[in-house]
Swiss-Prot record:
Mg(2+) binds at residues 247, 256. Signal peptide: none annotated. The active site is at 246 (proton acceptor). Nucleotidyltransferase involved in the post-translational modification of proteins. It can catalyze the addition of adenosine monophosphate (AMP) or uridine monophosphate (UMP) to a protein, resulting in modifications known as AMPylation and UMPylation. InterPro entries: SelO. Disulfide bonds: none annotated. Belongs to the SELO family. It catalyses: L-seryl-[protein] + ATP = 3-O-(5'-adenylyl)-L-seryl-[protein] + diphosphate; L-threonyl-[protein] + ATP = 3-O-(5'-adenylyl)-L-threonyl-[protein] + diphosphate; L-tyrosyl-[protein] + ATP = O-(5'-adenylyl)-L-tyrosyl-[protein] + diphosphate; L-histidyl-[protein] + UTP = N(tele)-(5'-uridylyl)-L-histidyl-[protein] + diphosphate. The keyword Chloroplast does not apply. This is Protein nucleotidyltransferase YdiU. The keyword Magnesium applies. The gene is ydiU. Its EC number is 2.7.7.-, 2.7.7.108. Keywords: ATP-binding, Magnesium, Manganese, Metal-binding, Nucleotide-binding, Nucleotidyltransferase, Transferase. It comes from Pseudoalteromonas atlantica (strain T6c / ATCC BAA-1087).
Length: 480
């Protein structure tokens, strides 16, 4: 079996052929077998000897077309044209059983022409975090890139301190970012911009070609997909942390994991990135940043669309986001009617857990056990403001009774949308600490529960607990 190389073949001057550089003592330590099988990749590839030969062998044809892509991006609101794949290469594309194409991208591959004097490596810490987060989001139903396999090494790399290098093969529909379009537009390379659009229409947005204005249809698709994604982030309490436009995928998926976090206590102003001193990418700011980023992308459509067309496409963002968010929040509360009363119940519930600084995920999981005819003491005892909680609960119970859905059915549905297990940063750190000492057992155990987030099992109770005080609201470094 061979990979396809459509991007490198058709857009070879939009980047550079770059072979991966071997790390010291590479070891294949984890393979995502389910994803491997979905991509119809041979199991024989994913052995220690085979994958090392394919990635680093002097005569390997596997990396003949490995490719570093060039792009720019708005970083914390400022334009930076000097970006690109600085630590990874596109290996090629594999097709699943439905004929859909998926990029295979090697992260931590070593220096590229876009490394900006850096070593081109990824550290074990950040690689494990991306592996865990992408699997956690995928199994919650949130669109995301995914991790195919993990390779460790003994090679030292230097960030805030000395760490070990690692590699990961990432899978995504493509690795085309908002910043690809921005770069060629702002650089005045309109021929390359046109070829990038043509490539996207052929390989990723073919349905748009049937529209009167394919470029408008493409922009509208990116707008609504991005809105839907960010609505899911908000509903599931996920803070990306570094929503620069070079970290935004044209497919509306979670992409480029850095200093992310799932919420602990519900705090809309939470900032997970310790470099984000002004809170630009705070949890509550994500919807507005999403629109800002889409507006930045839309400039690249101006050679093809009028200002009115672009404004019309961008105007769909808020309605798409709110429709998805409202539906998800109703489902999380087990409410099926889209009424003003339902919206008020959702807002008052969020205000209640915010005022009492309750854990976002545990609060929703407790809500799954509510009996519309019972006292529900465990839920009441969960709050400091018990009288306020009781008042809200009475209104909630009345709404449940009015809609008439059987309790067992409602509770089952709620348990399938409110996860028992989410990726807490402190749990990730415990797994990282063990892995850095050669023990991947905690990483694998954590990975297993994140791949089954809605299935409560007594033997995994430690992963459902709220974080200890030292593990709350951890701010994470961008260094990777």
């Amino acid at each position: 079996m061979n990979l396809d190389h459509s991007y490198a073949t058709h857009l070879g001057d939009l980047g550079a052929l770059t072979k991966p550089l071997r790390v010291a003592n590479p070891q294949l330590v984890e393979v995502n077998h389910t994803l491997r099988d979905a991509l119809q990749l041979p199991a024989s590839w994913f052995t220690q000897s085979s994958i090392m030969s394919m990635l680093f062998g002097n005569t390997s044809s596997f990396t003949t077309h490995s490719f570093a892509q060039k792009y720019g991006g708005h970083q914390f609101g400022g334009w930076n044209p000097d970006l690109g794949d600085g630590r990874g290469v596109l290996l090629g594309e594999a097709k699943d059983k439905f004929g859909k194409s998926w990029d295979l991208h090697l992260k931590g591959a070593g220096p590229t022409p876009y490394s900006r004097f850096a070593d081109g490596r990824a550290v074990l810490r950040s690689t494990l975090r991306e592996y865990l987060a992408s699997e956690a989001l995928h199994h919650m139903g949130i669109p995301t890139s995914r991790a195919l396999c993990l390779i460790t090494s003994d090679e030292p790399v230097y960030r805030e301190k000395q760490e070990k290098a690692a590699m990961m093969i990432r899978v995504s529909q493509s690795h085309i970012r908002f910043g690809h379009f921005e770069y060629f537009y702002h650089n005045g390379e309109l021929d390359k911009l046109k070829r990038l659009f043509d490539y996207c229409f052929e390989h990723h947005f073919s349905a748009c070609l049937h529209s009167e204005s394919p470029h408008l249809a493409m922009l509208e698709k990116i707008v609504t997909d991005t809105a839907t994604l960010i609505a899911k982030w908000q509903a599931y309490g996920f803070n990306h942390g570094v929503m620069n436009t070079d970290n935004m995928s044209i497919h509306g998926i979670t992409f480029d994991f850095g200093p992310y976090a799932f919420l602990d206590d519900f705090n809309p102003k939470f900032v997970c990135n310790h470099s984000d001193h002004r809170g630009r990418y705070a949890f509550e700011q994500q919807p507005s940043v999403g629109l800002w980023n889409l507006n930045a992308l839309a400039h690249a459509f101006t050679p093809y669309l009028s200002v009115e067309q672009i404004k019309g496409a961008l105007s769909q963002y808020e309605a798409s986001l709110m429709a998805e968010f409202s539906q998800l929040m109703r489902q999380k509360l087990g409410l099926y009617e889209n009424t003003q009363n339902t919206a008020e119940l959702v807002n008052r519930w969020l205000d209640l857990i915010y005022q009492d600084k309750r854990d976002y995920h545990i609060s929703f999981r407790l809500l799954c056990e509510v009996d519309e005819h019972g006292e529900n003491q465990p839920l009441v005892d969960h709050f400091i403001q018990r009288d306020t909680a009781k008042t809200w609960l009475e209104h909630y119970q009345n709404a449940l009774i009015t809609q008439g859905v059987k309790r067992q059915e409602r509770q089952a549905n709620m348990r399938n949308i409110n996860p028992e297990y989410v990726l807490r940063n402190y749990q990730a750190q415990l797994a990282i600490d063990a892995a850095q000492n050669g023990d991947f057992s905690r990483f694998r155990k954590l990975l297993h529960v994140l791949q089954h987030p809605f299935e409560s099992k007594p033997e995994y109770a430690e992963f459902a607990k709220p974080p200890p005080n030292w593990g709350k609201h951890m701010e994470i470094s961008c260094s990777s």
